[in-house]
């Protein structure tokens, strides 16, 4: 099984790449964490938000593996604790299917793409900068794995 993050937006600041890379490197070989960036639709006048999200959804769909469990990051998704995420990760591993976590652009994800999700999660009830999602999600997944393996990274 592998974990894939498909995120809208390219050219993130160096700290985003460094943060994501640090936790992706820590993941074990049997559970690799990869990132695929898709181009955000340019925010220009004359385009509706719906049209921009639809264009981004097309790019996201093209980046998704043929068979995977789709997990949408959404402000209305399930709010999980670290222990609950660890249990979810364990269930995903037991299912054996690759898991793709989908991060939308500045306006979110299109309703049509959201409808294809197997699950919806949210990282926080706080409003966070868009760029922070990648390293935060990578750290949360690494922490969940460390809980399952009784690794000393996570402490109760």
Curated annotation (Swiss-Prot):
CDD domains (UniProt xref): RlmH-like
Subcellular location: Cytoplasm
Any one Pfam family match given in the protein's UniProt record, by short name: SPOUT_MTase
Gene Ontology, cellular component aspect: cytoplasm
Chief location bin: cytoplasm
InterPro entries assigned to the protein according to its UniProt record, in alphabetical order: Alpha/beta_knot_MTases, RlmH-like, tRNA_m1G_MTases_N
This enzyme's EC code(s): 2.1.1.177
Key words of the record: Cytoplasm, Methyltransferase, rRNA processing, S-adenosyl-L-methionine, Transferase
Top-level division of the source organism's lineage: Bacteria
Binding site for S-adenosyl-L-methionine: 73, 104, 123-128
Molecular function via GO: rRNA (pseudouridine-N3-)-methyltransferase activity
Catalytic reaction list: pseudouridine(1915) in 23S rRNA + S-adenosyl-L-methionine = N(3)-methylpseudouridine(1915) in 23S rRNA + S-adenosyl-L-homocysteine + H(+)
Role, per record: Specifically methylates the pseudouridine at position 1915 (m3Psi1915) in 23S rRNA.
Subunit architecture: Homodimer.
Protein name: Ribosomal RNA large subunit methyltransferase H
Underlying gene: rlmH
